[in-house]
Amino acid sequence: MCSIGEDDFGDEGATHAMLPGSSATGTVLSAGSCSKCNLASDELYKLNFRAAECQLCFLSYARHKFRAALGAAKALPRSAEVLLLVDGSGASLVLLDMLHFAQTQNTFKRLHCNARVLYIDACGNDSLSSLHKLHERYAPFEFYVIQLNAEPKSLQSLKEYSASIVNATQQELRSLTARQDYGLQQRKRLIGAVAAHLQCSHVFESSISSTLATQLLTSVALGRGGSVALDVALLDDRLQDDIKLLRPLKDLNEQEVQFYVHAQQLQPFTSENELDQSSAASLQNLTSAFVANLQINYASTVSTIFRTGDKIAAKQQTNVDPTTTCTLCHSVLDHQLSDTLLAIEYSRAVSEMGVALQQHDNMEALEQRARQRLTAAQDLCHACRNIQAELTSGNIP
């Protein structure tokens, strides 16, 4: 018989409960000897659960994670055309610096690919000066800019870029949760279209372990459980024209990103958007705040959440017919009449009918109405149908 709880919990409750761990920010120490190369260094980097090491040893360790993620899965063919996404975050600048370093090595260690940089402008010209500084530092790369809701043909080089007014469908959605979810799907669709326009076969995204842990929980909460494996995997093949989305920083944590930014003197810049609002303003913001708190107090728990995503198998698509995928997010459709989805639509139908349910004849019509709602938009998955329901008028473009 299991004895857990007999000795581990006293009169005061969980006396042996998990205690907060070390800070996610780590420590940059003063001068000393590196525990790995034994050389004197002006600055030592102390990661959690790792001995203090010099800057060169730390950079070598972090860059190895980047190369190992790509090499272990053999996800990037030789001489591939790569589109690298930069959003101003520390992680995206780390990815840019790592790729630049990998391409400036000798022939044996060089990462053989041709890279271009894309910045998606969501709020005008606020970040252009920072982008120009990046372009000067990483001159070999071509920089492109496009607005979030613009057509792919409006793509411009950084030197020639000027913002224009575009229509924003997000403002027609009632809740911030729906606007953020729709904006994310639109961003992915735009990235795929731009990659196809530039004839790039692969896209690099700068998601790290804590970001992917947040994405995993958010996807499940939003009803995207069927595609959550691809949302957090190294390789996501849902973009159009067989373009592959790669996440080579998936094994890095926030602490390592902050140290890398400090070591390379990178200057992150962020754009003001809805993600910066109150932590309780949307489901995504609430989940992000929850994971951020875990990262500070229980860093290993975030790793557990993230590693759980690695063990989830992606839903296999037995038919390559485009009609079997969602027109918005390109995930495999889930419109089959399952008990769970039927119960959700039944509950919505009850709320809409209100006092009319007192009539006995309406009970049979209620279930019929719920079934009709499930089959009304067969080209959208469950989560994207929820976005459609949040529109004040019209349909998802």
From Swiss-Prot:
GO terms for biological process: protein urmylation; tRNA thio-modification; tRNA wobble position uridine thiolation; tRNA wobble uridine modification. Keywords: Cytoplasm, tRNA processing. Pfam families: CTU2 (PF10288). InterPro entries: CTU2, Rossmann-like_a/b/a_fold. GO terms for cellular component: cytosol. The keyword Hydrolase does not apply. One of its GO terms (molecular function) is tRNA binding. Disulfide bonds: none annotated. Pathway: tRNA modification; 5-methoxycarbonylmethyl-2-thiouridine-tRNA biosynthesis. It is found in: Cytoplasm. It comes from the Eukaryota. Belongs to the CTU2/NCS2 family. Plays a central role in 2-thiolation of mcm(5)S(2)U at tRNA wobble positions of tRNA(Lys), tRNA(Glu) and tRNA(Gln). May act by forming a heterodimer with NCS6/CTU1 that ligates sulfur from thiocarboxylated URM1 onto the uridine of tRNAs at wobble position. This is Cytoplasmic tRNA 2-thiolation protein 2. It comes from Drosophila grimshawi (Hawaiian fruit fly).
